[in-house]
């Protein structure tokens, strides 16, 4: 009987540093999604620091890593140490690496506190789906509640992102959360005396919204040496399974920075481009005192303009490949967007599309 999780399971997936083999982790995370998990996928060649930062900012229950590069013992132990140092030892670590991880190394890692390293023997006994269900069952933990951490955050962050992340989790799971800590309810001194702008970025799936967002973040950090930025990024949930691929971090090269916070949300509904928790997530980021907030929607159709309700300035990202010029008249956001970005401008017909728009 397939295991059905009682809670919304969120897992960070990646292939380890110096490892270009991403086939295995892509297979695993797709099965996780089919079982209803929300997967924050980072891609391959990811460092421990990047993975741990993402796991803490996203407030996940687990991290799943494939490692075929030979340095797995040090890699997994350092990940465990970094989580513990930052008061997030509750985040469980799972891994696999085929025959590159020896049985005695697996035993050593289990004793060190790694939740589970799956061996080729486990694959033969349990099968792919059996291993994934085991991961999801072990991660089926409720994270609601106050963000009371016993140790200070040691990552180089200008704000305690653990508290911010947990408050957004509460908002996702409970709607208007009654469990928000006093620090998260009380506006910071900066947020009381300034207007915090929200830029909404929307567009069709694959138009390059995340790449545009990353470029804005890069330029923001370069131009303002003392300002902070928060990103709330939404991806669609699958109607059939409830799972979601939250993959915007793959395109984000500038977010591993002390002045940047990013949170990925699933819509947890079909036929919508935004999560029901977007409004409170933005409020939480404002209360925390971020200077600038970007809201990135899931891919939208011609009629969707829902992002306008949540932002001060809206941007519609599109490509030159939209068909005949008459198709532009059907796109609702072109009537309302403050900015239109024609991305992938190296494509044929880009100058014509600029004229048509």
Give the positions of each predicted feature.
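Residue-level signature of catalytic and energy-coupling elements of molecular machines
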Residues: 21, 32, 63, 109, ...
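Cofactor-cradling patches in redox/metallo enzymes
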Residues: 18, 25-131
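Extreme N-terminal, non-catalytic leader segments
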Residues: 128-198
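Conserved phosphate-handling catalytic cores of large alpha/beta enzymes
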Residues: 85, 103, 110-158, 313-357
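Residues at the beta-strand->loop junction immediately N-terminal to the Walker
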Residues: 14, 202-205
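Nucleotide-state-sensitive switch-loop elements of NTP-binding domains
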Residues: 169-177, 188-196, 207, 216-305, ...
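Hydrophobic positions on the alpha1 helix immediately C-terminal to the Walker A/P-loop
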Residues: 212
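ATP-binding Walker
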Residues: 19, 204-207
């Amino acid at each position: 009987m397939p295991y059905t999780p009682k809670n919304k399971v969120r897992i960070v997936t990646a292939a380890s540093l110096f490892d270009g083999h991403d086939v295995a982790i892509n297979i695993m995370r797709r099965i996780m999604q089919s079982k209803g998990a929300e997967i924050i996928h980072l891609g391959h060649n990811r460092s421990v620091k990047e993975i741990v930062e993402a796991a803490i900012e996203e407030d996940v229950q687990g991290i799943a890593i494939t490692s075929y590069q030979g340095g797995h013992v040090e890699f997994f132990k350092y990940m465990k140490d970094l989580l513990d140092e930052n008061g997030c030892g509750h985040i469980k670590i799972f891994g696999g690496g085929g025959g590159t991880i020896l049985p005695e190394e697996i035993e050593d890692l289990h004793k060190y506190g790694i939740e589970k390293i799956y061996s080729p023997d486990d694959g033969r006994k349990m099968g792919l789906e059996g291993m994934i269900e085991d991961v999801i069952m072990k991660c089926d933990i409720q994270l609601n509640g106050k963000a009371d951490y016993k140790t200070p955050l040691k990552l180089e962050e200008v704000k305690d992102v653990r508290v911010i992340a947990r408050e957004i989790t509460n908002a996702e799971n409970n709607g208007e959360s009654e469990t928000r800590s006093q620090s998260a309810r009380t506006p910071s001194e900066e947020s009381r005396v300034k207007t915090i702008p929200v830029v909404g970025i929307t567009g069709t799936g694959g138009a390059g919204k995340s790449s545009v967002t990353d470029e804005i973040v890069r330029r923001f950090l370069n131009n303002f040496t003392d300002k902070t930025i928060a990103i709330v990024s939404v991806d669609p949930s699958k109607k059939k399974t409830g799972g979601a691929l939250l993959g915007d971090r793959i395109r984000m090269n500038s977010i591993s920075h002390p002045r940047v916070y990013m949170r990925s949300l699933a819509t947890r509904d079909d036929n919508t481009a935004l999560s029901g928790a977007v409004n409170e997530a933005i409020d939480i980021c404002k209360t925390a005192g971020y200077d600038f907030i970007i809201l990135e929607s899931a891919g939208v159709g011609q009629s969707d303009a829902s992002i306008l309700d949540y932002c001060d300035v809206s941007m519609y990202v599109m490509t030159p490949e939209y068909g005949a010029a008459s198709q532009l008249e059907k796109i609702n956001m072109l009537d309302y967007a403050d900015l239109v970005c024609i991305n992938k401008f190296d494509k044929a017909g880009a100058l014509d599309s600029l004229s048509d728009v």
